[in-house]
Amino acid sequence: SEMCIRDRYASEFELTNDLNNLISSYSHGMKQKLVIISAFVHSPKLLILDEPFVGLDPKATYLVKKAMVEFCENGGAIFFSTHVLEVAEKLCNKLAIIKNGKLLITGKMEEVIKDSTLEDVFMELTNNE
């Protein structure tokens, strides 16, 4: 149930004791955790997340990555934006690189990076932009 999912993530993200507090009293990181929990609570098929790791401490970042992988392994899909290329390279099986509203490349991760790294591909694509 939604309450079970909420309680599970609240416990994992160490927010259980704060759930009855006003959100305005939350730190930026706590608000970010709450947004992530609210995205998962209804068990959607698709999540669209904008910079989901901004403001998170290392433990919360790890937990979000773990939750994202579990979500996808259970048939869900996630579109997320990030400026941290290592995270995208590790988590994503498909990607799109967009610069100034222009789609520079899209495809399966292994086809895009080949024997390189995502950072190298990004720098090559955006060097003359």
For the regions a protein language model found, what residue spans apply to each?
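Helix N-cap at the start of a conserved alpha-helix in ABC-type nucleotide-binding domains
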Residues: P58-A60
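Helical segment within the ABC ATPase nucleotide-binding domain
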Residues: Y62-N74
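Catalytic Walker B motif of ABC-type/P-loop ATPase nucleotide-binding domains
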Residues: L47-E51
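ABC ATPase "signature
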Residues: T106-G107
